[in-house]
Amino acid sequence: MNGVFDLGGTDGIGPVDPPAEEPVFRADWEKAAFTMFSALFRAGWFGIDEFRHGVEKMDPALYLKSPYYKHWIASFEYHGKRTGKLDLAELDRRTQYYLANPDAPLPEHGPNQELIDFANAVVPSGAPAIRPTDKEPRFKIGDVVRMSSDVPFGHTRIAGYVRGKVGRVISHHGSFVYPDSAGNGRGDDPQHLYTLQFDATELWGEQYAEPNVTTTFDAWDPYLTLVTAPEGAAA
């Protein structure tokens, strides 16, 4: 889907200028948000692609002016409502209570060893998204392919700046969870994943592209159509 979250190639944003010593967390509540992700993921509120789509569902103005972990909280709320696991009226009541009573103690919970073990296993290295498939890869290294120009209404990993652009396959990684399916609640639907290389002139035009610059982009099989195969290879 289109949205303010897809800023690649957008004009008028200015340079990316992160602080030299940016802290991991800017406030204590961000630490809580970070830990909530593992708990809610483990509890089945969302998969990683569904989580991203929950962020994409944010009000655009709020998205642009809110800090990073506020995006996480918004996705938690979205999926809590979607799955029926969160009572938004109760959430509002508790929020108002703590706003009125900022020194009130938070509810206490004992440690959940299963969740701790899960977080210790997943947080440092992530959860693998590799999935087997009986489908054969449609493309080979060296193939010249065109990215889809479709604009799906739901979640996708096709960035706006590569839609309809022509690049070359430089790597094939195997089959992985397909975000356009998993992110929209339709299951893993494993698809082959490739890395494409684009000339800067293809992406930005002759007038603005830096000379001899290329950009790589990971793309799933359904995003692509063949333009030309390498000489001597079967199309």
From Swiss-Prot:
Entry keyword annotation includes Lyase: yes
Subunit structure as annotated in this protein's UniProt entry: Heterodimer of an alpha and a beta chain.
Keywords annotated in UniProt: Lyase
Catalytic activity: an aliphatic primary amide = an aliphatic nitrile + H2O
Pfam families documented for this protein: NHase_beta_C, NHase_beta_N
Usage in biotechnology: Industrial production of acrylamide is now being developed using some of these enzymes.
EC number assigned by the record: 4.2.1.84
Protein name according to UniProt: Nitrile hydratase subunit beta
Organism: Rhodococcus sp
Gene: nthB
Physiological role: NHase catalyzes the hydration of various nitrile compounds to the corresponding amides.
Superkingdom of source: Bacteria
